[in-house]
Amino acid sequence: MAKLIHTMIRVLDLDKSLRFYETAFDLHISHRLDFADFSLVYLRNEQADNEIELTWNKSRTEPYTHGDGYGHVAFCVDNVAQAHQRMRDLGFNPADVREFHDGASQLLARYFFVQDPDGYKIEVLERHGHYQ
C-alpha cells in the first residue's frame, strides 16, 4: 500500500521560510540535503506522519508562480481562535476565521487561511469531525 510521505514546495528565501514554518507550526528540520545548486529541507513536528519538503534553488532570484492548480496545505489545531490570534500577534496577517456548515446548521469546519513567505496558502482548521 502507498503512503504519503511529503509534499514539496519551492521557496525563494530558505531562511525566511524555515523561520515561518518553525514559528507558525512548530515544524523542525528532520533531514537536510545540501548540493551545489540546491538544497532539500524536510520539516515535521511530533504530530506529523508526513513532511513538507522545502526546495531551495540557490540561483533563483524571482518569486515562484503558483499557477491555477495549487490550492493549499492544511494543518489542524486544537483551538482555531487561539491559533488565529497567535498568527496575528506574530504579524503573519491571517484571513478571518470562517465556519463551514452542512445544509442545516451542523458545523463541518472552523478555519482560516494564512500565507507563507512565498505566498503559498495554508489552511488552519480546528480539530473537529473529519479534520483530526
Please annotate each region the language model reported.
Residues 43-47, 114-117, 127:
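Active-site beta-strand termini and strand-to-loop segments that position acidic
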Residues 46-50, 59-61, 78-82:
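Short, charged/polar surface micro-motifs in flexible loops or helix N-caps
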